[in-house]
Amino acid sequence: MRGILTLLAGVCAGAIAFPAYAQDAAAEEVDSTEIIVTAQRSNQRLQDVPIAVSAFNTEALEKQQIKNTSDLQLSLPNITFTKTNFTGASFTIRGIGDLCVGTTCDSATAIHLNDAPLAGTRLFEGEFYDLAQIEVLRGPQGTLYGRNATSGVINFRTARPSLAGAAANVELEYGNYNSVKAKGMINVPLGDVAAVRVAGFYLNREGYTTNIFNNTKIDDRDMYGVRGSIRIEPGPGTTIDLMAQYFHEKDNRTRIQKQMCQRDPTGVLGCLNGKRDFQVTNANTTFVGVLTSREFFATQGLPASLALGSIYGTDAYSGAVNPADFRTVSTDHVPTYDTQEWIIQGSIEQDLGGGLKLKVGGNYQKVDLDSSQDYNLSVQNRAVYAGALNTLAFFAAPATPGNPLNGAGLPVAYFAPVAAALIPNGPNGLLCTSLPVESGTGAFGGNRMCSLTPQDFDRSNQNQSSWSAEAIISSDFDGPFNFLIGGIYSKFHLTENSYYVNAFGIDYFTGVFGAFTALSTGRPPSYLGTPFFRNNTDDLAITTYGLFGEAYVSFSDKLKLTLGIRYNNDSKTVKARSTLASFLVPFGSTDATATPYGAGFDADPATVCALPGSNRLGAIGSVAGCEAFQVRTVKFAEWTGRAVLNYEITPDNMVYASYSRGYKSGGINPPLQPIFAVSDTFSPEFVNAFEVGSKNNFGKIQVNLTGFYYDYKDLQLSRIVARTSVNDNVSAKIYGLEAEVVINPTKELSINMNASYLHTEVSSDKFLANPRDFGAGRADAVIIKDITNGANCAVGSNSGNVAGVNTFVATVNSIINAGLVPGLKAGANLQNPTAFPSGSGIASTGAFGICGVLSAAAAGAFGAGVIPTGGVTVYSSGIPTNIKGNKLPGAPDYKFAAGIQYAAPMGDLTLTPRADFIYTGKSVGNIFGGFINEVPSFTQVNAQIQLDGPNKKWFARAWIQNVFDKDSITGLYVTDQSSGNFTNVFTLEPRRYGVAVGMKF
């Protein structure tokens, strides 16, 4: 290679790349050592753009081993990328990523393909192929790009067809994990006015993760992508581009790499707050653990022998193995991952004459996704269930042949369907678990999977489509004034988005409890539907349009002012609900939601349901206030803009200062009971962004520097409440520095470096409960595990009375045990509060109980004598703590990267060894911070050596990534209390190495 050049753009000091420019600009006369970008929607030298932008052309992507999005983030300062829990991903720029979780959330980082915005794209899943360039813009970009993005824009530019002549290339690669990859393209001119380009890739490899349960490999890849493009130039000044792209993946990709837990022996929390460890949560703390316990069954007057266990006894994960290796698991559920994406684009660019240009473009996108994975990444101990399964078989059998009653004197017809669905071969045979089907009938409708171990897994699926149209008129006058004006209109439609959690224990509870509920209310044999958790967005429609423009005023050859403005209008309507054991469903039903006993189901707790209950006669949605779905509409309209002043000190040195105001629309939270005090909606977020920068060339050294300060209002943050992701708003301050240096001592030797510093903090008071510690570090509090739903609440003393609050909980539990609470039977035998183990990170005590009864007792329902001196408060969502001053997630304090290569001439050949070193500092995985939420710093070293033939017509390459095989964590997710408070972690890929050969024609 004849010299290396910088790749970082602007002030934002990005990453360094090699000399090249986008193919769209190929007709222009430019220095071959310059990068041409379209950051301001026109072709400009990278070093002339007063925006924080980084660009990677095809050669840079290859040399720096940037094969996918995870690789891309390593080469950029103040940028991180991580997969997230629900099939999504978060690209974080300067501390701001997709901290909002939900179908109505907009992305903080806008992803564009050829300048067109994408929604829920799977570009993050696949491999990069036949790209002309990737441009990364930092900071709000609403006055130039599509939909709003408060953190920035990543614009993937595909290689366009060339009318200059026929061309083709092919590359074949083989690596460890039996990885086989192929990619290539062919370009064919069609006369003098058109050309066609077809490109594609294919990747197949074995899994990264060993499953010791059955000695198999999981987390493999089997994917391909294909793209066809047409360029037509019918006459001078007219360019028409058409493109269609398809991506498909079907394999056993895992959405998470590891699940971690410091096991809680008390069962109140499941996992403790002291550290992340290679243990498994205590199953007694889960929704299944409490609702199938002898203690809960006792409060309902059900036979203790039918309970799957005791909250104080051996739990279903006793003996479960969680290997202390990020690439080794023990799971009895094979993950599945199936996704496809269509993208169709068209644009026409017309020179209008007189220095004016018009560009009109449209984009259509369709995404389907279906993924399933073991929910707890562990194997349950079925021996714990043995007694209950034998009892179920007893209840399902007639006392004597032909007798309609069982040995307990109850009708067999109510229990036989449960046993037939879940233990078809008897209590010692296969155990069957519901499949997550839309009908909601699960195993009781014949939709089941059966195995020797109790299953628990989740499923995430979605179907969405979107389209957008954009028009831009820009000027290129010779005088001191130019402008750009444009508009965009887009529609997004989500027709299905569901998250399911399925477990044998849920099936058992919904079958057994449903049988007794139906029997006691005179209903026919029934189960509780749905026999799995389903958070379902049935329909989401988003309509948005924006009008934007910029004016460029040159006061002199050196001084230029840019002023931009944008009007934003967003409308969102969502139809959603969650179901889990919500209503009786008669056996034999083909659609659980068509039950005749669903009148008491209420999908919208914000309205008052006159007849709450799981067995009310009537169809779902037939009673006023008891809605079948929560339906909400929100609308937002805002003005944003920017101002930039740049000054060219010399032709090789520029400084600039900018102010921009960014906006991201608000949205709608899923339906939750009012007791959790979560707003139906969340507000838009705004950022006032200030930036100064300098771009400099000093002969063979290039130095770019940037400083920035962000003032955020109503930044959107997600947390889990009652098994559901909800979003809050906080204020935040962010500031940082970025530097990048490129040194070319000779034309053969090139060195690039970049470094960044980032400070983030919540800047205003915001009180939220930490899901890992509902007692908020208080010794005068008791954390409660509610045996009626698996949630946690907390009881806190109003006067610091430690003994008093513990005595209060013990007294209320004794009242429950005695059967003195209306609607509850005696015999629960709930125990007194107990301390958590040493090193747990929990100062409070813990106990099993019933939060609703504790709230009533605190209000005097059982007399003033129960309430201790000073009084107590019951916190349904935990005791809130002030998160002011806490760091934002996914924002490392420091990042550093350096690369060196030497292109050694060998006659007609060139041998180029290269090495890259990357350091990413520590960050936090969620807003509550602390050691347990820390994402450790990590380093990665990559290396390769490439031999290029004459005129680079062929090459052979040997490469290695992650040389030292680091288990680098990029993000984490803390689950709900009813699931056990475990932590899912996401990592970079392990060490990979291989060889590749390629040819150009």
Language model segments and positions:
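Outer-membrane beta-barrel domain signature, strongest for Gram-negative TonB-dependent receptors
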Residues: 215, 221-483, 490-493, 702-704
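N-terminal Sec signal peptide and the immediately downstream disordered periplasmic leader
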Residues: 1-64, 70-76, 344, 999
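Periplasmic N-terminal accessory/gating domains of Gram-negative outer-membrane beta-barrel systems
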Residues: 51-99, 109-128, 133-142, 159
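Gram-negative outer-membrane beta-barrel transporters
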Residues: 709-711, 728-927, 996-1000
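Structural signature of Gram-negative outer-membrane beta-barrels, strongest in the C-terminal barrel
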Residues: 233, 473-476, 482-492, 538-710
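Membrane-embedded beta-barrel scaffold of Gram-negative outer-membrane proteins
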Residues: 349-353, 357-363, 370-373, 498, ...
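C-terminal beta-signal and adjacent terminal beta-strands/loops
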Residues: 760, 918-926, 947-1001
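Outer-membrane beta-barrel translocator/receptor signature
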Residues: 64, 106-108, 120, 129-138, ...
